């Protein structure tokens, strides 16, 4: 069963991670949260089925925009409106690309978006994993400071996903990285991939 633990203080004085990786993951939802175009990727480990796309804000602003994005995330988790519970609740892991503020005047708005999405996951009892943007880029390209064009190119070359939207590309990168972290990646890892996986595992170690 998926496990979530509270943050505590480790012997070295640093806070330990707020989650432990679930032991029975079968469904990954990866999110590259954005105010205008949130990239997502869903993957079932048992069947290999994958889909991806973009959650667009469609001109909405403020609370209305936050509510619309959270609603779409809820839908992507397979929630049955009648039962009010996600179909895959006990086997789901959500992975989110952590904060990266491109525009200073949007920092608080992006923070609000991350907050309401994480609150929704908390309400549903779903664990989530945070991946730094530079870790995700390094996983995809081998370089943590890669531009969007290189990310798109290397995603096709290394992982076989031909997309033309960088938000979707980031979400697919998160999904494939999470598979590797869970030990479910089907191919041998090269040195830089091993390094990224090791860093993520260190951050989630109990």
Regions found by a protein language model. Name each.
Residues 1-206:
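Phosphate- and other anionic-substrate recognition elements at nucleic-acid/protein interfaces
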């Amino acid at each position: 069963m998926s496990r979530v633990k509270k943050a505590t203080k480790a012997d070295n004085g640093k806070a330990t991670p707020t989650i432990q990786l679930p032991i029975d993951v079968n469904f990954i939802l990866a999110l590259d949260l954005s105010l205008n175009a949130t990239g997502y990727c869903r993957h079932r480990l048992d069947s290999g089925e994958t889909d991806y796309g973009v959650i667009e804000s469609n001109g909405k602003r403020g609370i209305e925009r936050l509510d619309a994005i959270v609603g779409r995330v809820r839908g992507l988790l397979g929630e049955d409106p009648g039962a009010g519970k996600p179909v895959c609740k006990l086997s789901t892991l959500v992975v989110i690309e952590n904060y990266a503020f491109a525009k200073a005047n949007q920092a608080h708005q992006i923070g609000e978006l991350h907050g309401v999405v994480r609150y929704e996951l908390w309400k549903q009892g779903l664990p989530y994993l945070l991946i730094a943007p530079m870790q995700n880029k390094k996983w995809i390209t081998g370089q943590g400071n890669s531009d969007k064009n290189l990310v798109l190119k290397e995603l096709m070359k290394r992982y076989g996903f031909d997309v033309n939207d960088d938000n979707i590309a980031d979400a697919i990168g998160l999904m494939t990285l999470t598979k590797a972290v869970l030990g479910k990646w089907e191919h041998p890892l090269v040195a830089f991939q091993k390094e990224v996986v090791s860093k993520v595992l260190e951050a989630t170690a109990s």
